[in-house]
């Protein structure tokens, strides 16, 4: 890496070209706010991508080629002003401007409509252009135009990013290789099964912008191989704001179906999670096995946002609050299969699944700005998510006799709460030295209360509970508590007084401590012989009278009533501590070349202790990891001219196993089970990127990126043939590689200014190749010698086209958004089992909105128009056809929304 850095410095230094330029600078003030400085306004040279945005003090400054130019000053809801000026090489021209509201627009309306330009596409493209590191930023404006409703939809519209089974996959690297931050502070997952929080919690109402950092820099935590996704939460910019949003919608294959719901749940997602049984001779569970039913399902959401700014002498205090409720139904039917290692199908069942997802969110931002460049802010985020599902499965499943059928019903609720508290302070010591301090206290409380699973054998023309294993009919209670603490401090020192020179020295430190306690209690029903059961009234058998009459015995996962430890839950406890220090030097070598070199030191300790339901885990097991990392990084930026940029970046990072990936707790699903691996080792990642950017205008660009990743000890999800077809996590080889190319373009296709008509298009696509040489000596006994990485998508395309038409005070926007990803590996096969593959699918969404008089807005959204099949399949045995293991459709979602700005 050092050799490459030297070569890059020498090569780029040889092509530095001096250009004759001058500096234009000035101050923008706000007539509507008593001539106060106007922050975040756009200042652009007309017809080019040259420009800047004003800072908090209304100031701007940038270099332009010598000659005569037209400068445009603009801000949302304000008049756009143009000025012609002439500048000579080495000259500084000062252009100050007083900005005012558009004619016929009152101050209150301006306040409602205005938003920070850090949400606007043009401003974020300028930010991307000026940045030293390679990054992609998506603002609230672009999300609205493309009909994106949350952060997950946003990042999957960027090159090289696709949606995975839970979260996103970046350049072929899934959940464990990525990281998520909120305002630059680490954010834990709301779901113990995953490292990253589900991005669909973050609706556009709370997003200012989203940064996708595919290149590691020293300020980031080192546990990232794919990308860091940083969500910047909204804050109040103008004097006041109040709006409400509501929508109703349907799913085409759900709306009129008879829909089953779980006893003990409700539409708000609140229920009792405690265990009501403390005596195995008493059947005192609160909830019934029999579900309820309804026949009309209407999706609904309601949200509000409000805030106000107060002057406190010469200082400013502001608050901003967002709240929301969302409930959605989904009905799917399909088929599941399982095979032996030789490809023989032993499970083939049709299924219907009823899903209801409800969430509530509350975000608050309090901010106090004092003196010049000083501010302190408190951010709070509360997310409650409740997922309820009932799955019915009918068919054969490893039958003992010809004609045997099995009916399975699984009723599951996952209830998770996330509490985020952040304190962020910025202090400016001098014009060249400032300090930023951040801290967070995050808490997760999750439970899976009373999951009910039944398996009934159909033989001799009647159903009976399975007698082969007591665990075939169970009630499962799980609870998770996690506390996460983080702190960060960073000094930034500007090395030169020249405002245009970006040379800066940054240094600081991080601390993070995370602790998790997971516990699960399982109740099994041990039937000694077959007994007839009405599957529509199972509580007639699962009752106190059946225990009294010795039809079944109630026991826990640890044994029956005679076991003194019967009620001791299965547990694992995880603790992780990270100490880090970092430094970064940005140095400008002339007008065209900037180099950034950084390093990060991390000391990480992780201990997972467990007492679980896997026999070989022993009574008290432990998985300990203790690592020290020194992580170098560099970024080189060369401007051929104002609109043409080349960037090169390299870094080293790592991927650390998560708590649940090392804890050998077995989690049972319908056709798979999963468990951790206490022998899992971290991965080391080496990353190299080269990116060319061409800016056609302030809102148009074309980029090409080539990337290469080398991973030592890569981690993949792998299948181990055992009871229930178990998935686990393995270091699948000594090394793996991923390389590919990404192309992105944004273009104004057609525009008639005097008719206020604009048609815009966006396209990004990626092609990648991944390979891992599987460890032939592994105890996993991999079926193949090589494989693609789990989740690696060879081909990915995102495209959108939008039309924007204004009619006097009304605005119509409509967008068509397309996405496609090709087939990819879901899990790596072992011991004769072939890889499980996830079928590539296309999606197409239509989003239209109509704004009336700047206060009222109607929005029509139709998603998943193509309604493709979602499939998992196992690669064919000895070159035969793939066996489809799971197949279903999700239906088309249609919603109509209304919003009002007060």
Name each model feature, range by range.
Residues 713, 820-827, 849-902:
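C-terminal beta-signal and adjacent terminal beta-strands/loops
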Residues 29-34, 41-44, 75-76, 92-141:
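Short, acidic, small-residue-rich periplasmic hinge/interaction motif at the N-terminus
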Residues 202-245, 901:
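A beta-strand signature from Gram-negative outer-membrane beta-barrel systems
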Residues 403-424, 566-577, 625, 654-711, ...:
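Outer-membrane beta-barrel signature, preferentially recognizing the C-terminal barrel domain
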Residues 706-710, 729-824:
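Gram-negative outer-membrane beta-barrel transporters
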Residues 23, 287-391, 419-420, 430, ...:
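Transmembrane beta-barrel wall of Gram-negative outer-membrane proteins
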Residues 185-186, 386, 445-447, 464, ...:
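Surface-exposed extracellular loop regions of Gram-negative outer-membrane beta-barrel proteins
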Residues 117-118, 126-175, 184-202, 206-218, ...:
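Periplasmic N-terminal accessory/gating domains of Gram-negative outer-membrane beta-barrel systems
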